[in-house]
Amino acid sequence: METVLPKRKSHHLQGYDYSQNGAYFITICTHQRRMLFGPNQAPVGADSISARMAARVFREIIGQYPAAQCRYFVVMPNHFHALVEIQRPRADMESAPTVISIVQAFKRYSTVEYIRLVKRGQAAPFDKHLWQRSFHDHVIRNETDYRMIAEYIQSNPRLWHKDCFYEEPSHEP
């Protein structure tokens, strides 16, 4: 008897070619939204070795692709946002990255680096997966959309206390 597994629903824009030039807003969440890149109550940007590592890895991944750039990104305690732009000349179309390949490389390399931090006792252990299986993307279609998303990314740390996953600090001794 053959078991038929349910088809996984894609979060990506149906029929859209993610290898074409454009700007993309991506969000990647930690597995089970665990707070692995900084304490929940700490101000985002506080000295977290795991958050610094994720930022470094992302810069390195983007740096490997001349056709890709990222002016705005932020590492939050349980997720990551970036506004990625892909602009390449026609002749270079085959060798340039897709948003999906950038995200895959980031997840893979950041997981390897995070495991190194765990082994050195510098980061909290995680169960099987560092990142959720997929990621959310939004194709940016105009300048207004671009500016709104850039502002959202920049203000995300300041508004962390309003996030549904934020927890008030305990004042118990």
Predicted regions and their residues:
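Short catalytic/metal-binding and nucleic-acid-binding patches
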Residues: 1-173
